[in-house]
Each structure stands twice: as C-alpha cells, then as structure tokens.
Amino acid sequence: MPATLDPEGTAGAERGASAASDRAPRPPEPGLARCAGTCHALFVFDIGYEVDLEAARQRLSAFGHGRRFRHRSATHTASQEQSFPLVFEQSVGAEGLAEVLPLPFVRPLPEVLISVYPSGALSVAWRLPFERSFEELIALSSALYDDQSLERVSRRIAAEVQQSLGDSVERPRLAQDFEDYFAFHLPEPPRGWQPAAEALWASSGARGGQERALARLLRAERSELSEQEVSDALSQSISYAPGEVVFVDWSAALLLGADVADELFVLELATVELLELRVLDGKLYRGIEEAYEILSRRGHFLRNLAPLGGDLARIARIQADQALLHEGVDNPLKLFGDDYLARLYRAAQERFHFGEWDAAIERKLETLDSIHQKLSDLASTRRSEILEWIIILLIAFEIVMSLAEKLA
C-alpha cells in the first residue's frame, strides 16, 4: 500500500525546526559587530629640500634603523634602497599625550614611529588600539577627521626632529602644508561578518549593511550614505589572499588581514608623495609669481636698459630645482618588484589624484619655461638697444670731435 502522509507530524517537525532557528544566535547588526585592531594615524610634513640619510643615521645611531618591505617578494637594487626612509621610535611623553584631546573609545600609545625620507619629508605615525563595535569605530573615524590636536603635537615632534638632524637637512624649513591619513587594521573581520574578503568587495548588486558600514568608516561619516557614495568609497580595493583585503579611500583605508606591514608602508609612501606634489605645486606657483614680477617690472630709462642676467639665472635655478624635485618625487614608489604592492600603489594613486597633480605641475613648469623664454627675448632686445645707443653715442662723439677740430 502507498504510504499515508501525516500532516500533523510534518507540521510538528516544521514548528520544531522554526523554534530551533529562533533559539540559534543571530549575527549582530553590522554596526553592532565587535572588532579589535589598531588605527594608524599618519601625519606627514616637509622639513627641507632634502635629507642626507647617512648623516642623519649617524646623528640617530642610537635608535635609528632603515625600513624595508618585509614579507612580499619585492626586490630592490642598492641604489633604489637609498630612497627608503630612516625609521625610529620616539616617546611622546606625558605632556605630549596630555595635549591630545580625548578621542572616543581609544587612547594613543605613548610612542610614535618617525620616518625620515631623503626627499625632505618626515612622517609621524600614531598607533591607537581599539576593541569596540563597528559603529563606535565609525565614530572614532569621524572624530579623527575633525581632530587637530594630533596634528599639532605631531608638528611639534617634527620640528624637534628637524632640529636634531642639524645640517643633514639641506635648506631646512618646516612647511605649513601637511598630509594626514588614517589606516584601520583589523586582523580578523568583525564578529558575525562574512569572513570571505570577496564578499565584502563585490562590485555589483545591492549594497548590504556591511558595505554601508565600511563606506561610512572610510568617509568618516556618522550618517547613512547613498548607494552611489557607498559604491565610490569601496571602488578601490585590493586582495592578496582569501580573507585579506585593503580598501583605499582618499582620507582613510581599511586593512583586513593578519600582517599588513607592507601595505601600511605603501600607503605611507603614497601619502608622502602626495605631500611632495602639493609642496612642489606651491613652490612652482610662487616661482611663477616671482618670474612674472621680474618680467613685468618697469622703471626709469636706465633701469630698463640694465642687464637681466641675474634675473634669468634666478628663474633658471627655480626651473632646475623644481624639475629635479618633480623627477625625484615618485622615486620611492618605483621599487615594487611585487605585482600586488604595485596594484595597491596604483589604487592609492587613483584615490589621491596623482594624475591631476602631475598635469598641474607640468603646466606650471611649461609656464615658467615660457616666462624664462620671454625674459630671455627681452634681455636680447635690451642688449640690442644698448648696442644701438653705443653706436649712436660714438657717431655723435665723432661729429662733435670733427666740429671741434674745425672750430679750433
């Protein structure tokens, strides 16, 4: 006989399964998920034209050491490694920590990591350990974005290091311009989140709560973001191994993985390059103003006939200095023998708009060259005018002498 169905038994089994499902622990909301890690707050300053790292190393011999890529397969020549910074730790001290305004949920470690670059850049890296909910981490990101106390203390540390380096810094000057960047490192995904990195950076489909929370962290935004803003915030992501991913945005990054020392180094190098591009752009702007002032300068007759050799030499020096700086700005970033690190750098390059900065600098260099050429033409014209006046005076002198002889 065919087996008879037992509706009551089936319904009971379904009710039992439903009850068991209700009793099973549900994953927390993305914002409530707990996470532990470290926020690396980076501040980069320009302390001079360039730094002699060998001389700086001798001055800091007690605690300075070089910095290298540690775990990836990047290979470098000896000449390339000269572009790597000199790194050392320095205690902030109780007074320095007291100057830092209270940040939500974290307290900085009392030591900062300082890196001195041959290009004249100096970075101060703070480490802020945390173990909080992701929503609280977003609040920390927003507070760091608005905070000025860390930058103020970092600038004072940079000035002290600049003084300690002495004559190893050529043309020392602590510029007002600076760059900051915040990298949030999570050794493991927040509890209850999907562990696979690929699930976090899918580029299509509706964005879920995890993606929205990530975007708010990167944009330091307490309120909800639009779908378009979320997609843009997560558009630059790099993954090396299952369970590892790096999201790169213009002011912050999220690094998911156990060991991210190399990734942090690449992001620091990119931030250093961004500052150098900004400083170079400012120097070129001031150089153009100075050159234009020389070109448009007017005075009395004799002043207009004065030679322009000194002015031409000054503009030529500005051109040479800035062209050399522009050529050397990205030297530390031409060192990647590892494709993964190169891809990470390209993601940062895209986020920081290096292409636009390079184009603006090239235009300013061309403008400076154009002014130099016009000034050179003006100098040639003045030389011709001076020669003409000399000839006129000689002719007049001959006429006067002839008349004087006849009258005598």
Locate each region found by the language model.
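Short Lys/Arg-enriched alpha/beta "domain-start" segment
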Residues: 2-244
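Short, surface-exposed, polar/charged, turn-prone segments marking secondary-structure boundaries
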Residues: 71-73, 151-155, 275-276, 282-285, ...
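Short charge-dense sequence patches
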Residues: 226-242, 265-277, 310-324
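Switch/coupling subdomain of P-loop NTPase systems
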Residues: 255-289
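Membrane-associated alpha-helical segments
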Residues: 279-405
